[in-house]
């Protein structure tokens, strides 16, 4: 399987899991009326509509801000997809696929509802993490993959020594 195909599978799986989880939790359950749902002592399902970007930054109430964020997301998707198509390693392609799938999932929410549906809340005692969704988790995992790929040694280029002299000039 090519690196690109692996990245494409990661992209499509991320997008499908993200949208399915959001649609099921919002339209297929009574979470909106009965939240929070306690999953574990440190995790709940809740309903949060994020009108901003990561960590709730740049909250947008108006239509222009909403569509500007959709446009920026789609521009990033295009650029990262081109990079994924040219990726030289499976790790890089999968990392980019996770990021693109997550960005598309959140852009779909923003275009359809005016905000991103976040629902996973992790906490322990007084500590509380921001509320996120499958797309956000995939984006973070993709960034970790990008970092790991950047730390890998570059593959050595094959020797171009045709003359058999070890690459040294002739005397």
From Swiss-Prot:
Keyword DNA damage annotated: no
GO molecular function: aspartic-type endopeptidase activity
Reactions catalysed according to its record: Release of signal peptides from bacterial membrane prolipoproteins. Hydrolyzes -Xaa-Yaa-Zaa-|-(S,diacylglyceryl)Cys-, in which Xaa is hydrophobic (preferably Leu), and Yaa (Ala or Ser) and Zaa (Gly or Ala) have small, neutral side chains
Gene Ontology BP annotations: proteolysis
Keyword Chloroplast applies: no
Residues passing through the membrane, by range: 7-27, 64-84, 88-108, 128-148
Top-level enzyme category: hydrolase
GO cellular component, one term: plasma membrane
Protein name (record): Lipoprotein signal peptidase
Organism classification: Bacteria, Pseudomonadati, Pseudomonadota, Alphaproteobacteria, Hyphomicrobiales
């Amino acid at each position: 399987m090519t690196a690109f195909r692996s990245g494409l599978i990661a992209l499509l799986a991320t997008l499908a899991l993200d949208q399915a989880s959001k649609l099921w939790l919002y339209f297929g359950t009574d979470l909106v009326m009965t939240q929070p749902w306690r999953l574990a002592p440190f995790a709940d399902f809740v309903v949060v509509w994020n009108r901003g970007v990561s960590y709730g930054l740049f909250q947008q109430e108006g239509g222009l801000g909403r569509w500007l964020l959709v446009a920026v997301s789609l521009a990033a998707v295009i650029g990262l997809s081109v990079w994924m198509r040219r990726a030289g390693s499976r790790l890089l392609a999968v990392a980019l696929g996770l990021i693109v799938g997550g960005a598309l999932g959140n852009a779909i929410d923003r275009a359809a509802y005016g905000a991103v549906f976040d629902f996973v809340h992790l906490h322990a005692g007084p500590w509380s993490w921001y509320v996120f969704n499958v797309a956000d988790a995939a984006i973070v995992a993709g960034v970790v993959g990008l970092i790991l790929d950047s730390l890998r040694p570059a593959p050595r280029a094959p020797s171009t020594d045709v003359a058999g002299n070890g690459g040294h000039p002739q005397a």
